[in-house]
Amino acid sequence: LKLVLISTLAVFTSGAGLFSSKNNDIATDKSIKSTKPWANIEGFRSAKFGMRMDEVKKSITRDFAIAGGKIDAISHPTEQTQSLGISVDNLLPNSGKSRVVYVFGYKSKRLMQVNILTGQPVDMDIKPQQVVDAGNLLGNHFFKKRYQEDGLVAHARLSDGSVLIFRGKDQKGRMALLRLSNPQPNAKKGDDLKITLTLSYI
């Protein structure tokens, strides 16, 4: 995908013009590379990469006080992977409902990826600016750590118009990826834009 660097975090150039960040303390690419300490991407909260499904269920209960009956078991029809899914309210301040999916390896049966979705269609009532604010908050969190220069991306627009807020790998090659979906390209002021923030730990 062709990447075109953009100067501000999570800015959509749609007709609505709603999505400019108010945060003036955005880190630059140079500061991301030199900032210490190194990032350590181990999983999500107490659920760590390499855990078995039963261990992740215990982590979910510990992290979110969600009982086993409210944890969804998901099977991918083509990749044949198994996942656990939960819904969480206000995972970030004023961010509405989020969907957290823990993905396990087909052969290893161990946790290998965590995907977190905020915004549409997880929460049909959330305001677009709430989703953008959540992206800004997460982006600035990632920018405080140091990552490998290889593959490091910040503030980039993808060819489909979506915004890659951040992509970076720790010293072990584990990745965090934060992406804000493209709103409707022909949206006008006042339109009900449907955008999604996706955070993946891989």
Descriptions of predicted regions:
Residues 59-95:
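Short N-terminal edge-element motif at the start of the domain
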Residues 92-96, 122-125:
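Short, cysteine-centered beta-strand-loop-beta hairpins and adjacent loop/turn segments enriched
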Residues 94-97, 171-173:
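Glycine-centered tight beta-turn/hairpin loop motif at sheet-sheet or coil-to-beta transitions
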Residues 17-72, 113-202:
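Non-cytosolic coordination micro-motifs
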Residues 4-12:
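Bacterial N-terminal signal peptides
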Residues 100-105:
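Hydrophobic/aromatic beta-strand elements that line small-molecule binding cavities or substrate pockets
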